[in-house]
A protein has these predicted regions:
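Short, conserved phosphate-binding/catalytic loop or strand-edge motifs used
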Residues: 138, 203-211
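Short secondary-structure boundary/hinge segments and terminal tails
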Residues: 60, 142-143, 207-208, 254-255
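Histidine-centered active-site/metal-ligand motif
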Residues: 201-203, 260
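Acidic, glycine-rich loop-and-beta core segments that form the ion-binding/anion-interacting portion
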Residues: 208, 213, 219-260
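ATP/Mg2+-dependent ligation/transfer catalytic cores
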Residues: 1-199, 221-225
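Generic beta-strand/beta-sheet core signal
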Residues: 21-23, 143, 200, 212-214, ...
Length: 260
């Protein structure tokens, strides 16, 4: 009987690449790009990556004190999160992506895996007969890919003009329409990735928007979906020569971004 990886490859014979992704302590996606055949290898526990990469700092350096690098920088087995395997619609070729979690040779989760840490917290909720219900609201700015001369970000140009967005315009549908192609791609991405994206609105600053996910009571799944939604937004923006930033305060004079 074929497993999920073999079935996925049968359904997508023209697949060109698979991205194996895990999230480090800072929310940065790390992993490998590999040939489609590697998916079968990964589904059987044959894909490995270094444990130390979970605790890299935001500059990608190994922080002192973890002991992971000096002890040999060992690898761990990467297990595919099956329900995360999907085609990526923002790719120029037919590519797929999936999340992975790391475990040791005995099947025990790696202590530094954020998914494992969250699972441990959720077990404590279960002991209290509680179940958290999560519905993230994700705020972000769409900005020009070109920075100002001083290195600061700048608003994108209003389509068909040489002017940049300046007005707050909360809930303005005209500004949403200006980025219709971007939001269509984000919606398509959410649908293909199984992300319960519910609404998108214009937020309280020029070029600022919010996408809400529909609430449910599987907190680990919601954490996966929120990460994948953020990645989808960033990659979709690049297709329209924009950058999406979730930075807390990219503009000192405008409202900050939050996730609540």
């Amino acid at each position: 009987m074929k497993n999920f990886a073999e079935k996925f490859l049968d359904e997508n014979p023209d697949l060109e690449k698979v991205e194996f992704i895990y999230v480090d302590f800072n929310g940065i996606p790390r992993g490998k790009n590999a040939s489609p055949k590697t998916l079968i290898k990964a589904s059987k526990g044959g894909l490995k990556m270094p444990i130390s990469s979970y605790v890299l700092d935001v500059w990608g350096d190994n922080p002192k004190g973890t002991g992971l690098v000096m002890s040999g920088d060992g690898d761990a087995i990467c297990r595919v999160v099956e329900n995360s395997l999907a085609i990526t619609p923002w790719s120029s070729r037919k590519n797929a992506q999936c999340l992975v979690s790391m475990e040791d040779g005995d099947g025990n989760p790696i202590y530094a895996d954020p998914r494992h840490i969250l699972s441990t917290v959720l077990k404590r909720f279960e002991e209290l007969e509680l179940k958290p219900v999560i519905a993230p609201e994700m705020e972000f700015y769409l900005i020009d890919q070109k920075l100002q001369k001083n290195g600061h970000p700048q608003m994108p140009l209003i389509p068909g003009t040489n002017r940049r967005y300046e007005e707050v315009q909360l809930l303005n549908l005209n500004e949403m329409d200006d980025f219709e192609g971007f939001f269509d791609l984000v919606e398509k991405s959410a649908r293909l990735l199984g992300i319960p994206a519910e609404t998108a609105i214009k937020e309280c600053a020029p070029g600022q928007f919010e996408i809400n996910l529909l609430h449910h009571d599987d907190a680990l799944l919601m954490a996966d979906q929120a990460f994948l939604m953020k990645r989808s937004i960033k990659n979709s923006a690049k297709k329209f020569n924009l950058n999406a930033t979730f930075m807390a305060k990219p503009f000192s004079e405008h409202a900050g971004n939050g996730m609540h």
